[in-house]
């Protein structure tokens, strides 16, 4: 039986707390760019007729809904997240959409995905992998439930390489973002966000971690001058 670590429980509690303002703050703090990043990531998925797609760390369901909008009605989508509050809000969004019959959401951690081996054509995770305490275990679980020939698509924040832009980015991320986020939600949560991004490995280091659990043909695509990166790999 999988049990979250103390750090994992604190991160889970943090997301439960900020869930009601999560979507609003994502739009404000990213100036709305996060939507285009998600669309780019979803374009990278692979699926078959009557296929199945898993969205890990689904949050309030933005990526799951984007997948539903861009795939045939025969494709089913499952979203999982370790935050019960996030999943509850996601279920409400899905129920209010035209894709309610295609998207199922449930509470589950990335490190212990409750599905059989070789279950999904593609797996997505957006802005979630850096919050997985045992990152290698999370990647192993995604690899396990991915079908042979299937693709994982990982969207995550990254640190820009262009020096001047990197300094501006760090100023906004470290100084401005926590203050703005704290006005509407929990300050500590929006202090955690930039810290977790800065601590995340480089693109090449993360691709090496993906390859280490078995993913092949690992690639990355930098978005918006390197603020975000999409990683892909295949089984």
Curated annotation (Swiss-Prot):
The keyword S-adenosyl-L-methionine applies. S-adenosyl-L-methionine binds at residues 60, 81. GO terms for molecular function: 2-methoxy-6-polyprenyl-1,4-benzoquinol methyltransferase activity; demethylmenaquinone methyltransferase activity. The keyword Membrane does not apply. GO terms for biological process: menaquinone biosynthetic process; methylation. PROSITE patterns: SAM_MT_UBIE, UBIE_1, UBIE_2. It comes from the Bacteria. Keywords: Menaquinone biosynthesis, Methyltransferase, S-adenosyl-L-methionine, Transferase, Ubiquinone biosynthesis. NCBIfam families: MenG_MenH_UbiE, PRK00216.1-5. PANTHER family: 2-METHOXY-6-POLYPRENYL-1,4-BENZOQUINOL METHYLASE, MITOCHONDRIAL (PTHR43591:SF24), METHYLTRANSFERASE (PTHR43591). This is Ubiquinone/menaquinone biosynthesis C-methyltransferase UbiE. It comes from Geotalea daltonii (strain DSM 22248 / JCM 15807 / FRC-32).
